[in-house]
Curated annotation (Swiss-Prot):
This is Exopolygalacturonase. Optimum pH is 4.0. Belongs to the glycosyl hydrolase 28 family. InterPro entries: Glyco_hydro_28, PbH1, Pectin_lyas_fold, Pectin_lyase_fold/virulence. Monomer. PbH1 repeats lie at residues 159-184, 186-207, 209-229, 239-260, 269-290.
Amino acid sequence: RGVQSSGSVFNVNDYGAKGAGDISQAVMKAWKAACASQGPSTVLIPKGNYNMGEVAMQGPCKGSKIGFQIDGVVKAPADPSKFKSDGWVSFYRIDGLTVSGTGTLDGQGQTAWAKNNCDKNPNCKHAAMNLRFDFLKHAMVRDITSLNSKMFHINVLECEDITFQHVTVTAPGTSINTDGIHVGISKGVTITNTKIATGDDCISIGPGSQNVTITQVNCGPGHGISIGSLGRYNNEKEVRGITVKGCTFSGTMNGVRVKTWPNSPPGAATDLTFQDLTMNNVQNPVILDQEYCPYGQCSRQAPSRIKLSNINFNNIRGTSTGKVAVVIACSHGMPCSNMKIGEINLSYRGAGGPATSTCSNVKPTFSGKQVPAIKCA
């Protein structure tokens, strides 16, 4: 398949990329030439197997559109200490970027996962993410595969108008901190027609995310699609306008999840929609938890002060491997408001069935039928 955009092509082989050697210098030279080019331009890593150290593609670029096409299989150094930063392939301050191709970015993360439990050790050094997108506008990422990242596969920070289409993310279900796509402080994010199998959240939405639309995502193994955690730090920006629709979860720990810390600084998440979702043997299909406190790092006595409002759950069906299929635990200090719960049909076939639910600190409006029945205190 040819290069997808018209314009000049900057093939890394022409800049000294050699099969067995580290191609990072060749990639950076090709990027500099493409970025300085007036018209549309594309950096091409053609079919083949390559080794590549850390690379950072910096903008702004002269042309209005620039492509980065990966058709080869590119491997990161296996040793986590070979990285200066927390990103292996990073893109900064670029308008009109398209990252595409039939290739694979292989983070060779197996060594890092053994040391990666930063949840329990706040001072640990984060391993490198496969892909970092920072301060981008009008970006498209399509068709590529991220394999075995050392940490998050894809991190999106302070971006505006970025789309992920037909992306594949793969790592074992046992890999630690390998979130598929993490979004923070970004507006206008679309994730569609994408397959994510990993050891942590398939998609996680952090503070400051607005207008994020997630459709036609297959998630599993993994920890589901999460909003949060919110309220861990001071001055977090609010979350607004998150839609998760037409997605399938298979063998995951969670389906859709909202998590906020107790005893939190003030904050908010509003306009959250979870609709037309299929759960295949999911441990916690629906979980809204405002007492999220992993590893006992906080006190649950003081309530979360993250205000959750305008939340819709509708047409969520399938099978739960946990008896409590729906958990809605809103903050006792700041109850959820304007929650709508429509059709839910989740079955549990294990011991002590059928499925049950818990619901507290909210008075939802119900429509249609809920299985299990949901009674809120």
